[in-house]
A protein has these predicted regions:
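Conserved GNAT acetyl-CoA-binding A-motif
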Residues: 36, 66-78
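A short, internal acetyl-CoA/4′-phosphopantetheine-binding micro-motif in the GNAT/acyltransferase core
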Residues: 40-50, 78, 186-189
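Conserved active-site alpha-helix within GNAT-family acetyltransferase domains
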Residues: 79-97
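Conserved acetyl-CoA-binding loop-helix of GNAT-fold acetyltransferases
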Residues: 49-63, 86, 193-196
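Nudix hydrolase/Nudix homology domain
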Residues: 178, 216-293
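The catalytic Nudix box helix
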Residues: 166-167, 182-215
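Acetyl-CoA-dependent GNAT
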Residues: 3-38
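Acidic, metal-coordinating catalytic segment for phosphate/diphosphate chemistry
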Residues: 116-155, 161
Length: 293
């Protein structure tokens, strides 16, 4: 099913100025100005932890969707690194591209992805306060949780004996679609950060790690996440890499100089960029010490 974008936009409030919703065969037809959508993404990125920033917009959309019992839309804006809107609940995913023949932006619904996504097992996560003390609240992915709480995310920088760094390309259905990244994921309920890091690497790129392989080089509070970053020096080559294409669709092995350049690329995962740049000095010291020995 293809949904075409129109340039018709009528609104009475700032929220309504961002997008206009219509019904179409059980899905949602999203009409918007490209610039307005990008404006919303910027606001969400900058003020994500302020729940009231999007309250009126959420209320407006839920009113439109109430009859069909649909309470989640995800749409991607061309050139953007994150979804424009992410309401909690049922998942609908729209891919956006520019159709040169019709000179229009087009959203395509990936039904196979929706079917697979709806079959996924529920994921649960422990939550923490600002000081990383565990609290008595378990978060289910896709549900809301108090703005004062955080969950743990781990990032793992994999370096082989040839001094090459593994960088992957995110599946277009994920947040930050088609962004370059190092292996990154959330720590599940009952896991330690190191256990979560070992699991994420195995699941996403097929490489076996031991917890003792992980050297922590940085941690930071970013939005609603405690981010822990590790580096692992592993004897692997391309024959060891098995991608989970639901998560990542391609990979490359980069030299240190190439990696330093890609970190600043607009399509590099912003979470990875923040934690690596924040901890760059310690990371460089660890790498230098390892290859000097």
């Amino acid at each position: 099913m293809i949904i075409k974008i129109t340039n018709e936009l009528s609104y009475n409030t700032d929220s309504e100025a961002l997008l206009l919703l219509d019904k179409e065969i059980g899905y949602v037809n999203i009409s918007l100005y490209d610039n307005q959508a990008k404006m919303y993404i910027f606001i969400e990125e900058e003020y994500r932890f302020h729940k009231y920033a999007t309250l009126s917009l959420n209320a407006l959309i839920k009113e439109y969707l109430k009859k069909d019992n649909v309470d989640r839309i995800v749409f991607y804006v061309e050139g953007s690194s994150r979804p424009g809107l992410n309401l909690m609940g049922k998942l609908n995913v729209y891919y956006v591209y520019f159709d040169e023949e019709t000179n229009e932006h087009v959203y395509a619904v990936d039904k196979d992805y929706l079917a697979n996504e709806n079959k996924k097992e529920k994921e649960y996560f422990d939550t923490y306060d600002i000081n990383m003390n565990k609290v008595d609240f378990v978060w289910e992915r896709g549900k809301k949780y108090p703005s004062s709480l955080y969950h743990i995310v781990v990032s793992v920088l994999l370096i082989n004996k040839d001094q090459k760094i593994l960088v992957t390309l995110r599946n277009p259905s994920k947040t930050h679609p088609l962004c370059y990244e190092i292996t990154t994921g959330s720590v599940l309920k009952g896991e330690t950060p190191r256990q979560g890091a070992v699991r994420e690497v195995k699941e996403e790129v097929g490489i076996d790690l031991k917890e003792s392989d992980l050297i922590e080089f940085g941690r930071a509070v970013i939005e609603d996440m405690h981010v822990l970053a590790y580096v692992a020096f592993i004897d692997f080559d391309e024959s060891h890499i098995i991608l989970d294409e639901n998560e990542v669709i391609d990979y490359t092995l980069l030299t240190f100089n190439e990696f330093a350049q890609i970190i600043e690329h607009k399509d590099f995962h912003p979470l990875n960029r923040k934690i690596i740049n924040k901890s760059k000095k310690k990371l460089n010291e660890i790498i230098s010490r390892h290859f000097a020995s």
